[in-house]
Amino acid sequence: MRNEAAPLLIGVSARLYTPGAAGMPAQGVWSKTLHYLEQSVAWWLLGGGALPVMVPAVDATSIVQRSDIALHDYAAALDGLVLQGGNDVAPQSYGEAPLHPDWQGDRVRDRCEIELIRAFVAAGKPLFGICRGLQLLNVAYGGTLWQDLPTQRPQSLEHRVSGRDEQHQHAIEFVPGTRLAALYPGRSGSHTNSLHHQGIKDLAPGFVVEARCAGDGLIEAVRGPGPGYLAAVQWHPEFHAPGDPRLLDDGAILADFLTAAAAARRESVK
């Protein structure tokens, strides 16, 4: 039986590195397929008192196949799941063909994460998506994406500036009456980092928009329908330095997610 007092175990979907990436050496560890966890995500969760556990992906070339891995066992063993950022969502995952060779995305990761989403939702465990995680959650429930904002939505602000990464920022506005807005009483919005070139085009049925970019209206935060906890943001909360007065303090978002994870654990040990 799980100890309710033990630290929460939060799964983090793996980022994938495939050999042959431009500019990378073709020797040593770089000649291997890597599954990895960006350290800021780990530190963000650890800072909230949780223990991050990376969940690896498998594909048709793996020695271990999907049929050998019961994803519901991951969902049963862990208290929640974070979908971390990374490569583009593949256009094929939402019924489109890539408009440019650089926008192929990561179909393998898409498939694995969509299966993880289903397993955790079925187990009644909370999910939180970051950047790509927001986009994939939207796609998993029937939404679509802009493959490239500058090309397909030229009225958009710059949401990614080469060389600046998370140093690039813009203002967001909370949608009144939403759970996200309730976490920040008395505030209409804030500033966040921005380092993405894709974004939500068609919102998944039943999902609620919780924040938008103040400058162009692009969706920046969503919440899924039903009694479970499905939430995601387009920015990277793990890159926000605690106490930085220029940026949103994401501690309330993390605490809200971990509170849901603790509640899910209590339900699982009844």
Task: Identify the residue ranges that each predicted region occupies.
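Active-site loop->helix "elbow" adjoining a glycine-rich segment at hydrolase catalytic centers
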Residues: 132-134, 141
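Active-site-proximal beta-strand elements of phosphoester/diester hydrolases
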Residues: 231-234
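N-terminal beta1-alpha1 cap of cysteine-dependent amidohydrolase-like domains
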Residues: 1-128, 139, 146, 150-184, ...
